[in-house]
């Protein structure tokens, strides 16, 4: 039975009912709706709407219903209720009779869904932080195991300077750390409870909304009822954080796809996260990474969709706001899955250290070291940059690396170049020189790994 039928003389059209109903997706709020109802029962008992005996009856019934859902949430989807609020109320009435009809006193579905969504978002933030930490653990483990894997670093997808695979892993650790902190910040702003705001103007009963908030795991009640039932900032913040994180995960996946390709062959992804071709027997496709990269779009779409939905809404609640749910539900499931699969991809990754080193030795990635060498000899950097550019052109024409040029050949470009140039052109020297904080110097990378382990409690 609908919660609003008294005003109407005709039944809702079946097509409209399907269009309007939300139980098929907002069933995910079932536990939050029940917990919110338990809190509300206590609040209205405090102002004499319910007796203590009635309060206890309702709480027992609601907890029974909660247990039933936890054992089999699919029972909800067998019903044709309009939404999760209607479903919970109807099941409560089945258990306690007319007493169940008293629970909604002073409450609107507007503040009810607002608190349900905020409670759900709080749970999601915690779960997602756990998934982020798990992927960070895998990145640190992989970094620790591959500190000696020298590889080319890229700009413009061209070999730029030598790095290590460990340094690459720690770059994504840092991105995820920012994602983690954004969730922490978003969670802090979910500390206010909208329940008790009514439809838009507040409740007519003098309940202690701060006490209600604390019963439901919030710090305080919201300060403005109009804002309370209209606010979906917490949904937007989660979607925004998810979108930024999916950018990081997509780049992570793209790097691995490239590193795994035959063109680079820096590493091999495990059979556990790859698939084959129905036609080409030799293929081993990086589908896990490609799906992470591809799924970023649907998360971005959820954020864009909700921003567009909310931008022109007048205060307070409008049915448009029902459109906040499918996007956030899908986006959080997608983000969580991508974090989990990202960690799985790293479990059995096999880095080809010979190939990565060979690639690092190509592409003149030690050219910057030669420029720094000239600077140390008293030549201004801009001039040194030009000299090294000419030397690189010469080496390319000979199809040789810089370190293969003779001293006589080097002196064509500047007379200060001598035998002492060769040690600084080695890959080890290139790495060692980058010793400032955050650099690829092996000791700095080890320090970063140890600091990350402390941060993760490893």
Swiss-Prot record:
Gene3D superfamilies: Fumarase/aspartase (C-terminal domain), Fumarase/aspartase (Central domain), Fumarase/aspartase (N-terminal domain). The keyword Transmembrane does not apply. Signal peptide: none annotated. Its EC number is 4.3.2.1. This is Argininosuccinate lyase. It holds the Pfam family Lyase_1. NCBIfam families: argH (TIGR00838), PRK12308.1 (NF008964). Belongs to the lyase 1 family. Argininosuccinate lyase subfamily.
